């Protein structure tokens, strides 16, 4: 699975939503949408503990 900046993921355990803020080499920085939580993880860990969710589309 290719992960890009702006992708959204949901934590499998808590259901909390995260957005991919930055990708540096193989490190992915996830930031929570509603709280100041931030994680720095590898792509394999993201796939293991998070489910991909739909990206919100802008409404014009």
Feature locations, PLM:
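Short coil-to-beta transition motif at edge beta-strands of beta-rich domains
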Residues: 1-11
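Basic/aromatic-rich interaction segments and small domains that mediate binding to polyanionic partners
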Residues: 10-41
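Intrinsically disordered, low-complexity, charged/polar segments
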Residues: 34-60
């Amino acid at each position: 699975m290719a992960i890009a900046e702006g992708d959204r993921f949901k934590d499998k355990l808590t259901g909390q939503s995260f957005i991919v803020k930055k990708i540096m080499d193989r490190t992915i920085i996830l930031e929570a949408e509603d709280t100041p939580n931030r994680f720095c993880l590898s792509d394999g860990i993201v796939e293991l503990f998070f489910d991909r969710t739909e990206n919100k589309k802008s409404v014009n």
